[in-house]
């Protein structure tokens, strides 16, 4: 019975990460002047707004290349974003929203293993697919 709950938790984690990953691919092609603009854009897109409409409404730009213009530097979700803590905050947020919810479902040795997998998935997601080994035993 506990195994079924663990499997369900992992499946839910993978589905949620898949949905979030799909959003990040879209967000990676927009640049905003500040964090407020980025939050506005994200909320607009989450509500179903189109990229051009959300970018115009929130003061952001849609780009086709890999880097943002100098006057639109904030949170473009690319390595050159100039935000050194973006990856750390992403990982913390992912672990808090996804992995901690799994931890509340059931406790046990299987759950610790699943939590490690979830943490590694969050780290890979937030580091643009780079594999990062977990230091947890």
Curated annotation (Swiss-Prot):
Disulfide bonds join 31-68, 32-60, 40-58, 44-54. GO terms for cellular component: extracellular region. It is found in: Secreted. It comes from the Eukaryota. The keyword Secreted applies. The keyword Signal applies. Residues 1-28 form the signal peptide. Residues 75-137 form a propeptide. One of its GO terms (biological process) is defense response. Keywords: Disulfide bond, Plant defense, Secreted, Signal, Toxin. Pfam families: Thionin (PF00321). GO terms for molecular function: toxin activity. Belongs to the plant thionin (TC 1.C.44) family. 4 C-C subfamily. Thionins are small plant proteins which are toxic to animal cells. They seem to exert their toxic effect at the level of the cell membrane. Their precise function is not known. This is Thionin BTH7. It comes from Hordeum vulgare.
